[in-house]
């Protein structure tokens, strides 16, 4: 059974964008309440704080910008080599509750990882996708006037060192991983292609 149909939803590849610029664009898009879209992109290095974020989970201050976002969740890191996918969807029209939507996004990530022979799992109460207890994909969402925005980030082929400066998603000692460490012959473009195909098949 398909998770949901994405009739007339445009999937856009935005390349590399500053987080703050994209954050403003998302809010403007959703405020109009007219269309739906899915954006795929990379961000320049940035730590983002969710609405539940506690500053104590920033372990070391660096020259990487810190931005307070309005998504759910704690602190995370975005940077080049990580695929970020924002889902700007009318979930009210699609009759999707937050829990069901999160489950569908996790399913999308897991299906994508399987394309690269990577087995993964989810953890009840801790949204995201894990490989051998290491987090490979994060989920953070916001819902406003029946729309979703923000989305998921998948670690593909990136510098993971900045994660050492935080407790990722608010969990002390949580380790992170990426596709490159498990499936060496990988590029961001390959993952984008698989994600887009899976969106068309699953959603």
Q: For each predicted feature, which ranges?
A:
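Conserved phosphate/anionic-ligand binding catalytic regions in large, soluble enzymes, centered on
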Residues: 147-155
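C-terminal accessory segment of soluble enzyme catalytic cores
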Residues: 160-203
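Short conserved catalytic/interaction loops centered on acidic-Pro-aromatic/His motifs
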Residues: 120-123, 150, 161-166
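Conserved, well-ordered active-site substructure
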Residues: 140
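N-terminal lobe of the biotin/lipoate ligase/transferase fold
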Residues: 1-136, 185-189
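Short, functional N-terminal and low-complexity linear motifs
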Residues: 73-79, 159-166
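A general nucleic-acid interaction/assembly signal
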Residues: 143-144
